[in-house]
Regions:
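N-terminal secretory signal peptides
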Residues: 1-53
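A mature extracytoplasmic/lumenal domain signature
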Residues: 36, 45-48, 61, 71-77, ...
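PEST-like low-complexity, intrinsically disordered acidic/proline/serine-rich tracts
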Residues: 39, 52-54, 80, 94-95
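Short, surface-exposed coil-to-beta transition loops
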Residues: 51-57, 68-70
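Short glycine/proline-enriched loop/turn "hinge" motifs that connect secondary-structure elements
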Residues: 58-64
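C-terminal partner/receptor-binding element of secreted or periplasmic proteins
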Residues: 74-103
Length: 103
């Protein structure tokens, strides 16, 4: 899994993902796509988000018998906007990890 390294790559990735999966909007700041077959969640900012254009790729992984989630973020805004976006996406990743944890 690799998130975009440039704004142009982020847009190309968004176009590719949008052509293969149904979007699941989350408010007006994100568009989310679930790639169930590859256990991935793609999250793209919309123009309403201060850190636009940005993308996060969350992948469900198994390691040493445990299920977890890895997240990569490609942010192409100011340092402050990207730091805020990282906190948002990391919080989402933590929610996924918690949901996957054995109860």
């Amino acid at each position: 899994m690799r998130c975009a390294a440039t704004p142009a790559e982020a847009e190309a990735l968004r176009h590719d993902i949008a052509g293969r999966f149904q979007p699941r909007a989350e408010g007006n700041r994100f568009i989310v796509y679930d790639d169930v077959a590859n256990r991935r969640i793609w999250m793209f900012t919309t123009q309403a988000h201060p850190a636009h254009p940005s993308v996060a790729c969350l992948e469900i992984v198994a390691r040493n018998g445990a299920i977890g989630a890895e997240i990569q973020i490609g942010c192409f805004s100011s340092a402050a906007n990207c730091a805020a976006l990282n906190r948002e996406f990391e919080a989402r990743g933590a929610q996924v990890r918690q949901a996957l944890a054995p109860h």
